[in-house]
Amino acid sequence: MSSETGLGTRLRATSGMGDGIEGAQMLGQHQPALPQPQATVMNNPDPPEITRPNQPKRQTNQLQYLLKAVLKTLWKHQFAWPFQLPVDVVKLNLPDYHKIIKTPMDMGTIKKRLENHYYWNAQECIQDFNTMFTNCYIYNKPGDDIVLMAEALEKLFLQKISEMPQEETELTVVQSKGRGRGRKEQDASITPMRTRVLSGSLEDKSTVKPPVTPVSKPSTPTPPTVTRAPTPPQTRPQQGRPPAIAQAPIRFSPTISQDVVVPTTVAPTLVPPPLSNHPAVIHTAAQPAKTKKGVKRKADTTTPTTHDPLHESSPLPSDPKPPRAVPRKENGRQIRPTKKTEVPDSQLPAPPVLHPQPAPNAERDTKTSEQLRYCASIIREMFSKKHQAYAWPFYKPVDVEALGLHDYCEIIKHPMDLGTIKVKMENRDYKEAQEFASDVRLMFSNCYKYNPPDHEVVIMARKLQDVFEMRFAKMPDEPEEAPAPVPSLAPGPPAPSIKGPPPTSSDSSSDSTSDSESSSDSEEERAQRLAELQEQLKAVHEQLAALSQPQPNKPKKKEREKRKEKHKRKEEVEEPRKGRIREPPAKKPKKSVQGSGGTPSIKKEAPPPAPRPARPAPPSAPCESSEEETQRCRPMSYEEKRQLSLDINKLPGEKLGRVVHIIQSREPSLKNSNPDEIEIDFETLKPSTLRELERYVTSCLRKKRKSQDKIEAPTSGTVKVKGYSSSESESSSESSTSDSEESDSETAPNQKKKGHSGRESRKHHHPMQQPLAAQLPVMKPPSPTIAPSYPLPSSLDSSHISLHHPLHPANVFDAVMQLPPDLPPHLTGQTEHCSPPHLNQHALTSPPALHNAMPQQPSRPSNRAAALPTKPAMPPSASPPPPAPQPPQQPHVHHHHHHHAQPPHVLLEDDEPPSPLTGLPPYLQPLQKSQQPPTQSPIHSLLTSVKVQSQTPMAAPPQSMRHLQPLVYPPPPSTATTAPPPASSHIHQLQSSPVVPQQLPAGQAPPPPQQQQQHPALQGTLVSSHQQHVQHQHAKQQQVIQHHHHHPSPRQQKQETYPGGHLRDAPSPLLLHSPPVPPYPGLTHPPSPQSVQPKKQEIRGASVLQPQPVVMKEDKRHSPSIRPEGFSPGMRPEPQKVPEVLKGPSHIQPRPDLKKMDGGRPIRLPDQSLPPQGMPEKEKQKQEPKTPVAPKKDIKIKNMGSWAGLMQKPPVTPTSAGKSTSDSFELFRRQAREKEERERALKLQAEQAERVRREQDRMSRTREDDEVQDQARKAHEEARRRQEQQQQQQHVQSNLPTAPSPAQSSQPMMDQREMARKREQERRRRQAMAPSIDMNFQSELMEIFEQNLFS
């Protein structure tokens, strides 16, 4: 670091800032400054020169970059403060500094030199920077704080230098110097003599008392009126460092315009030579303060002062006041209070803004006040709880008495604390921010000086100083940054810095300043203007980003209403003026356009909707030009915005892209936002944008209504519900994917209010895959029409109401009301599910149950499962409990489950194109279609055939039989049953219907749904075995139906043998109350008969199915004319027919475990459900757990009677086709059983072989162990014998006492014997344990058992 000091031999005990003090004192090297400058022997040398009067001024692009980019950045750095002033060796007590450092340098000097065009090229300036850093490294120790700060600054400096322009080009030199931007160059030529005289006189005075007269650039030649400032200058120390001193105490009367006070006694010869280059004139209002950052006012370095800045609060002698207090008045300028001193420009420390254009004095005042306000905020922050943990020791002055610090006052000459600083700030004793910073740094320096470095107070001080320096470095540097950024790019404050009126006191000087500026500062002005515009643009972007942020807390309803009214009034007033461009009012509802799956969806946080019956219809057609313009800009009411949000939520995903485009094209603030996710506040959108959105949404919804009307026209039938074709439904469902998720919960209340008007219901049905609802007459029969007498089963609850119309459950009742009265309401729910398989392939997710015992749910604008792709089916074991709500099904179902009561030929016409069985005869297609849908299509087809008989007399009997076919002959299903099966309550309702006069006995009430879920894996097998029994039953009872069904017997058999697909979707009794089990992925296209699970489970299913003692009694009484039970197709075995069915398979014929129950019904007892002969005990155990499922079979079997009665309605035409079909089924079942038997036999053989192999291995291992042990034993015995022989020989040979030697020889024998004994014990233990525990065998056995149990 360098030292720039006062003039001549004057002692400079006053350093402008505490920067240098602190920088050195933090190192612990410094002693307290001497308060009396005369007492010190040290003196500061002359400061480095900052001007070259004999050399022409030169400006280059690199020098300009160094000033405006490099130096400005370094000056604002938090570690820059020790380097902003020359090292004051007097204040810091560094007597050897100038012996070690021969070329002092500091950033203040470099800054002045750059402003005065001192350097000829950039290399000279860079050399000065390097000198400054090198001085710091030479004088200070490597680990010192000041060295670390210098390294940080140097790193930043080198980084900035690397960005400097490579080629240096000369620029035109701006004649007006940094201080006198408003002055012409000739002013400088007029004033030098007076300047010298003044500075000389001041120097003369300064030897007696510390004058506070700064030296500045030449000022305008005005008569030297000597006027003392009304306020005392005591607290204003003057120093020669540019950024150093706060010149607060010297206040100049703002009413005086003259700028120079020259005592007549001053001899000009006293001025040192540098003064000619930098004349020390008391600066008046004629010289504007530079609008620079950091330090507010730049003090003249040429005028020495003996006043210690640490004593700023102490009064100074008032004698020096007259020479420097030059009151002035600026024409036309508002007079500020005296506390905001109009200090001559030369007294101001160099501000950190590095461009030479100064701002007017008015701006200087503004800037000063802004920075002081910022300083006050720093003080407040340091007093806050946030920093209280380490700032509390500095809140109050050091209490020397209480703490016993008797030497404190001797070491610390100028105590300081935050409390004192705060008081001074409140009393406005600080005139510039640098004074405040000096006091704060003095406080820290005192702490570092008095306390040892490892003291906890020092650690706390360092923490607090870090906070202070960080905040202080961020202090606003220019007034133009203070005002909030506005879109207009010409804010008031920046203008003066670009091309402001000259701050001179006279109009002529003002004119000359503006002329010189306009001629010379073009380059700098352009650069500065560009920087300012960029900053403003950045601020505008930040403001827009803040505005576009979602409102953290939604305002209360009353406030929203008030704001709405205020907004309306304001818009009415502003409408004629603003036209289309209108500023939106405060935020109210939020709408976020958010992409789901790449397609933007719009989410609206709608406030509680105001009650209103329906939204006002949007403008139907544009008016004439002016009227249209007015309409386009007409502000939207709150209700219209809310309705628009609801309508946007109804749009399909592909339309939302256009919505985003409209918003982005009309709202500049959102132009660059991500289209996949846009957060929009409706209140921030212009009325024209909202109107355009309204027109677009209305047109989209109108098109959708028209397309729905067209599609409805061709459909016919008793229920006026249109059925979409597959392609239409696919597209419409896909189009409405993204908006369903978000709007479901939020818009439910809104639609609930509107759900009772036909127009509103259409509105809501449109966007959400409910085109059918537009054609449904919304007759609202009360829910009790179904609820009291026919409790809706879970399947009807979930899939019928929610599938038909998730928005309005009442629409289901509309369809019910249109059905003939002879059908109970649950059948209408069933008919809704009669849809071709291609429509139901996606209906895999369970909709929320809308049980009709519950109140009607609010209408919902979307189906949460709308856009989901087809999901693979889940195994039945994962099925949820029946009462659980089922999520709405896929949108395709919404469009297509509308063939309710149409004649079967109408169904064929609608569904033929996508039907997978186009090759089948037309009369078979309804059958196959009824097999495929995962919803209760068989029941529906039966009902439609019965219902439509009068309408289609010729085709009715065959069609009804064909529809019954899936009920009579479903193939053995796998465990995965597809659609939501009809609950048994459906069947009970059939019994209570006019067609079924007889009710179920109480003993046959369906078991609770939980029972049906206990063994979900058995459901398919149970269904299959019952279906087989039913085949025989219907072969005898309903031959006409079977004749029609089995007429195309080869093809029919082929179709029926499919275990997958939807044949087994005929309501299985086991699943009547169970939740819908999603189909396996391949079930929509049935696999071959040999597919997976059915084969394994048929035998078990049949055997488990049969132990039903209680329920089967009832079945024997059923005759073709009696329908005592709901018919569960394919599940009710007729008691008389089962023996025939069971005779087929060779391994089933013996059946010793079957017994007749009340009428010859073969029932397998629970304890007799054994596998065929040859099965090991494990296989038998595997099937025993399945016997408790018997109650489930009861449900299935008991549902058959009513269906049997319904099937008998067509004329009976006895044929033998039914029997042949049943035989073919029996053959298939027999083959499946045989195959399963073979598989089990093979598995048993493999297990037996594995068991034998393991036993052999075990035996071989034991044999090997025995052999090893025997060999060891033999070897041991041989060794022992040899030893005994040797011992005997030794005994014989010598009569001497050889006791020790036999003992020694016998010892190894004893060890060997002990070892052999242990081995034998281990062998026997293993032998004993071997038959009892074989862990490998046990684990394998458990695996086999588990496989057999769950397979």
From Swiss-Prot:
Asked whether the keyword Ribosomal protein is assigned, the reply is: no
Would you kindly state one Gene Ontology biological process term found in this protein's UniProt entry? positive regulation of canonical NF-kappaB signal transduction
Coiled-coil spans in chain: none
Q: Show the ranges annotated as biased composition (Basic residues).
A: 554-569, 751-767, 892-902
Kindly state which keywords UniProt assigns to this record, in alphabetical order: Bromodomain, Chromatin regulator, Chromosome, Nucleus, Repeat, Transcription, Transcription regulation
Q: Where in the cell is it found?
A: Nucleus; Chromosome
Record field: compositional bias (Basic and acidic residues): 327-343, 570-586, 629-638, 1150-1161, 1176-1197, 1226-1284, 1311-1323
Which segments show compositional bias classed as Low complexity?
Answer: 208-219, 505-517, 725-738, 788-799, 994-1003, 1011-1028, 1301-1310
**Gene Ontology terms: cellular component:** chromatin; nucleus
Site: Acetylated histone binding. Where? N140, N451
Segments crossing the lipid bilayer: none
Give the Gene Ontology MF terms in alphabetical order: lysine-acetylated histone binding; p53 binding; transcription cis-regulatory region binding
Q: Where is the composition biased (Pro residues)?
A: 220-235, 349-359, 482-504, 607-621, 872-890, 968-983, 1075-1089
Show the InterPro entries listed in the entry. Answer: BRD4_CDT, Bromo_Brdt_I, Bromo_Brdt_II, Bromo_chromatin_reader, Bromodomain, Bromodomain-like_sf, Bromodomain_CS, NET_dom
Biased segments, Polar residues type: 927-953, 1214-1224
Residue ranges, annotated region (Disordered): 1-23, 35-58, 168-244, 285-368, 478-638, 700-799, 821-1334
Q: Where is the Bromo domain?
A: 58-164, 366-475
* Annotated PROSITE patterns: BROMODOMAIN_1 (PS00633), BROMODOMAIN_2 (PS50014), NET (PS51525)
Output the superkingdom of the source species: Eukaryota
Segments of this protein annotated with the region C-terminal (CTD) region: 1051-1350
Q: Where is this region: NPS region?
A: 504-522
Its biological function? Chromatin reader protein that recognizes and binds acetylated histones and plays a key role in transmission of epigenetic memory across cell divisions and transcription regulation. Remains associated with acetylated chromatin throughout the entire cell cycle and provides epigenetic memory for postmitotic G1 gene transcription by preserving acetylated chromatin status and maintaining high-order chromatin structure. During interphase, plays a key role in regulating the transcription of signal-inducible genes by associating with the P-TEFb complex and recruiting it to promoters.
Protein family per UniProt: Belongs to the BET family.
PANTHER family xref list: BROMODOMAIN-CONTAINING PROTEIN 4, FALZ-RELATED BROMODOMAIN-CONTAINING PROTEINS
Domain topic, free-text comment: The 2 bromo domains mediate specific binding to acetylated histones. The exact combination of modified histone tails required to recruit brd4 to target genes is still unclear. The first bromo domain has high affinity for acetylated histone H4 tail, whereas the second bromo domain recognizes multiply acetylated marks in histone H3.
Q: What is this protein called?
A: Bromodomain-containing protein 4A
Organism equals: Xenopus laevis (African clawed frog)
Source taxonomy: Eukaryota, Metazoa, Chordata, Craniata, Vertebrata
